[in-house]
Design a protein with these regions (language model features):
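An N-terminal assembly and electron-transfer interface module characteristic of large anaerobic redox
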Residues: 1-167
Length: 167
């Protein structure tokens, strides 16, 4: 996608770790003093590492997990634990905040969480306008035409928004 003129931002792995911890606290599996201290140390380390790197690389601030879950809620209940809610909530939140122009969902061939997110992203596109491309990988490179078409549409929409903003 970068070869096609798009700026690509990868979803940070930290969000999955934060989500797993959030779910453990919500279920009541964590909550003691030791858990609170561990959480404080982890958040402090993350902030000290992510903050400076984010400035250099132009990364957006990661969304708090409750905000990510809230963004995904109209499309997927968080009771279905797993990466599907993150695959939906992270790009929806970023789209609503104007941080992205499209989302690419990449997963292994026939991965059920990926299929669920792909199906729901169709509804997100209809209701909110978020352009998305789902790639189910089986070891073969993706079809270049899919990437070309996605990049073309992202650029077209961006140019239209920019023209409307300056008019």
């Amino acid at each position: 996608l970068e070869a096609r003129g798009l700026r690509v931002v990868l979803e940070p792995m930290a969000e999955m770790l934060q989500y797993s911890e959030h779910q453990a606290w919500a279920r009541g599996d964590r909550g003691g003093l030791g858990d609170q201290l561990e959480r404080w140390v982890r958040e402090r380390i993350f902030g000290r590492c992510h903050g400076p790197a984010a400035k250099v690389f132009g990364w957006p601030e990661p969304g708090p997990i409750p905000e990510v879950l809230e963004a995904a809620a109209p499309y997927m209940r968080d009771a279905l634990e797993g990466e599907t809610v993150l695959s939906l909530g992270v790009p929806i939140r970023a789209w609503r905040r104007g941080e992205i122009d499209g989302a690419v969902l990449v997963g292994p061939l026939e991965c059920m969480p990926n299929k669920l997110a792909e199906a729901q992203l169709t509804h997100v596109a209809e209701r909110e306008g978020l352009l998305s491309l789902a790639l189910s990988l089986n070891g073969e490179p993706p079809d270049p035409e899919l990437l070309d078409n996605f990049a073309f549409e992202v650029k077209r929409r961006w140019a239209r928004r920019r023209a409307a903003a300056t008019a």
